[in-house]
Amino acid sequence: MSPSEYAREVAKRRTFAIISHPDAGKTTITEKVLLFGQAIQVAGTVKGRGSSQHAKSDWMEMEKQRGISITTSVMQFPYHDCLVNLLDTPGHEDFSEDTYRTLTAVDCCLMVIDAAKGVEDRTRKLMEVTRLRDTPILTFMNKLDRDIRDPMELLDEVESELRIACAPITWPIGCGKLFKGVYHLYKDETYLYQSGKGHTIQEVRVIKGLDNPLLDTAVGEDLAAQLREELELVQGASTEFEEEAFLNGQLTPVFFGTALGNFGVDHMLDGLVAWAPAPMPRMTDVRKVSADEEKFSGFVFKIQANMDPKHRDRVAFMRVVSGRYDKGMKLRQVRTGKDVVIADALTFMAGDRAHVEEAYPGDIIGLHNHGTIQIGDTFTQGEEMKFTGIPNFAPELFRRIRLRDPLKQKQLLKGLVQLSEEGAVQVFRPVANNDLIVGAVGVLQFDVVVARLKSEYNVEAIYESVNVSTARWVECDDVKKFDEFQRKNELHLALDGGDNLAYIAPTMVNLNLTQERYPEVRFRKTREH
C-alpha cells in the first residue's frame, strides 16, 4: 500500500462518542446517525416497553429490559466521504468508569442536551473528563418538538456552566407543536420540519435566504418575524464559529433539532465530518505516537464479556493509534512481553460482528480475549512503550457479596475477577478473611453484577452491607516501613482483581489518621491501568 493511500485512509476517519445526561436522547441520536450512515434502514424506537424492536445499540439483557445503554458499543458507518466510528457510552448516571475510559479512545465528542432541561449533572461530569484532554465538542440541542427553554438562555447556560464558548450553526423556528424547522446561519437557508417522519430520512424542503417571502408563507408571518429578530440578537451576542478554537476544545458549534423526529441530525453530522479532527496523536510513557506512522500501535480501553451469548467469550476493544492492522498480524503485548498473532479481530455494528481484514488509526477493533488481555494494555510491532492516561477510579460504594449456595465459591470468584477485569466493578479480597467486597462508582453497577453472575456464571449472589466507606491503592518505596504498615493494618488491607494492594477504610476519619501516621506510604485515588 502506498504512503498516499494510507494517508487517505487515515484522513477520512472520524472517531467520536456521544455524552449526555440520561434520557437526553442519546440512544435515539445514535439510531438516527446510523440511519444516515445507512447502517440500519428503519430506526428502532427506544423506550417502548415490551416492543420487540430494540434499539440497535442496546444489546445486553439488562439493557433490553430497562431501556438504558449499559455498555459501550462501537459502530462504524460511512458518511459522505468519511468513515465514522461512533462509540456509544452508557447513559445511565451510574456507569461512569466505562464512560470515562471510552472518552480516552475518541478524538471528538457530541454533547446532547435536552433543550427542555438544559445542562444537567451528568453532562457536567463528562465535560470535566473531556477537559483533561481538551477534546473538541459539538453540541446538539435535542427535543425541539417539545416545549423547550429559551434558546439564548440555553447557550448562556452552556457557556457559564461548562466554560466553553457557543457558536450557533442553526437556529430554531418555534418549538413544541409550533416547531417549524431551523435556519442555518452559515448557509443562509431554512430547513422545514415535518412531524411524524422520524423513522426515515426525510425529504426536507429548503428555503434560500432569510428575506425570502416563501419563508413567511411556510412558517407564518409571526414566527418569521420572531426568527429575524432573534437572529439579529444572536449575531450580535454570540461567538462566530472558528475551527481552531473548536479543535482546542474552547468553542462548541451548536445545532438544534429533534432526534426522535429525525430532524437536524444530518446538519450536525455534516459539521462533524467537516470540522472534527482526523485521528489524533497519543502519548506513551516514552514519546508521542502520531497516526501517520507506519508501525502499528494501539491500546485496550475496555473489555466486554459475552458479546456472543452462544460463546462464553470476552472481547477487548482496542483503539488503533498508528499503522495498519492486517489479518494474521503478529503484535507484541507490551505488558507481558509476548508476541501474539491476531488472526481474527472483529469490527462491530453493536452486537453484530464481522471479521476485519484491515483497520486504520481511529478504528476500534475487537480482540478475542481468554483472560490474557487487560484494560490499558498496549500492543505494538515490537516497540516497548505504554499508552498513558487510562484511569481506574477508587470506588465510592461498597457491599459484601456472598452466595446462596456456598459450594459455588469458585465460580463466584471467577465471575467477579472477570467482571473486574472488564471494568464493570472492582472486587476486593480482604487479607485477613475470606470475604469478597465489591466496589462500584454507582449503585446500578451492583444490580448489573448480580444479574450477570446469574445469567453468565449461573451463580446466585446476594449483597450485605459492609463497614467500608472508601478505598485507596497503597504503595511505598521503603520496604521496611511498608512491612510494618501492612502488619499493623492487616484488618484494613485487601487485594483487588489485579492483585494490587489497597487500603479499605471504614471511615474517612480513619483514612486521614492512617495517612498522617504513615507519611511514607502513598494512598492513591486512581490507578493507571
UniProtKB/Swiss-Prot annotation:
<dbReference type="GO" id="GO:0016149">
    <property type="term" value="F:translation release factor activity, codon specific"/>
</dbReference>
<protein>
    <recommendedName>
        <fullName>Peptide chain release factor 3</fullName>
    </recommendedName>
</protein>
<keyword id="KW-0547">Nucleotide-binding</keyword>
<comment type="similarity">
    <text>Belongs to the TRAFAC class translation factor GTPase superfamily. Classic translation factor GTPase family. PrfC subfamily.</text>
</comment>
<dbReference type="InterPro" id="IPR004548">
    <property type="entry name" value="PrfC"/>
</dbReference>
<dbReference type="InterPro" id="IPR041732">
    <property type="entry name" value="RF3_GTP-bd"/>
</dbReference>
<dbReference type="GO" id="GO:0005525">
    <property type="term" value="F:GTP binding"/>
</dbReference>
<keyword id="KW-0963">Cytoplasm</keyword>
<dbReference type="InterPro" id="IPR000795">
    <property type="entry name" value="T_Tr_GTP-bd_dom"/>
</dbReference>
<dbReference type="InterPro" id="IPR005225">
    <property type="entry name" value="Small_GTP-bd"/>
</dbReference>
<feature type="binding site">
    <location>
        <begin position="20"/>
        <end position="27"/>
    </location>
    <ligand>
        <name>GTP</name>
    </ligand>
</feature>
<dbReference type="GO" id="GO:0005829">
    <property type="term" value="C:cytosol"/>
</dbReference>
<dbReference type="GO" id="GO:0016150">
    <property type="term" value="F:translation release factor activity, codon nonspecific"/>
</dbReference>
<keyword id="KW-0342">GTP-binding</keyword>
<comment type="function">
    <text>Increases the formation of ribosomal termination complexes and stimulates activities of RF-1 and RF-2. It binds guanine nucleotides and has strong preference for UGA stop codons. It may interact directly with the ribosome. The stimulation of RF-1 and RF-2 is significantly reduced by GTP and GDP, but not by GMP.</text>
</comment>
<dbReference type="Pfam" id="PF16658">
    <property type="entry name" value="RF3_C"/>
</dbReference>
<dbReference type="InterPro" id="IPR032090">
    <property type="entry name" value="RF3_C"/>
</dbReference>
<feature type="binding site">
    <location>
        <begin position="88"/>
        <end position="92"/>
    </location>
    <ligand>
        <name>GTP</name>
    </ligand>
</feature>
<dbReference type="InterPro" id="IPR031157">
    <property type="entry name" value="G_TR_CS"/>
</dbReference>
<dbReference type="InterPro" id="IPR009000">
    <property type="entry name" value="Transl_B-barrel_sf"/>
</dbReference>
<dbReference type="InterPro" id="IPR038467">
    <property type="entry name" value="RF3_dom_3_sf"/>
</dbReference>
<feature type="binding site">
    <location>
        <begin position="142"/>
        <end position="145"/>
    </location>
    <ligand>
        <name>GTP</name>
    </ligand>
</feature>
<dbReference type="InterPro" id="IPR027417">
    <property type="entry name" value="P-loop_NTPase"/>
</dbReference>
<dbReference type="InterPro" id="IPR053905">
    <property type="entry name" value="EF-G-like_DII"/>
</dbReference>
<feature type="domain" description="tr-type G">
    <location>
        <begin position="11"/>
        <end position="280"/>
    </location>
</feature>
<dbReference type="Pfam" id="PF22042">
    <property type="entry name" value="EF-G_D2"/>
</dbReference>
<dbReference type="GO" id="GO:0006449">
    <property type="term" value="P:regulation of translational termination"/>
</dbReference>
<dbReference type="GO" id="GO:0003924">
    <property type="term" value="F:GTPase activity"/>
</dbReference>
<dbReference type="InterPro" id="IPR035647">
    <property type="entry name" value="EFG_III/V"/>
</dbReference>
<keyword id="KW-0648">Protein biosynthesis</keyword>
<dbReference type="Pfam" id="PF00009">
    <property type="entry name" value="GTP_EFTU"/>
</dbReference>
<dbReference type="GO" id="GO:0097216">
    <property type="term" value="F:guanosine tetraphosphate binding"/>
</dbReference>
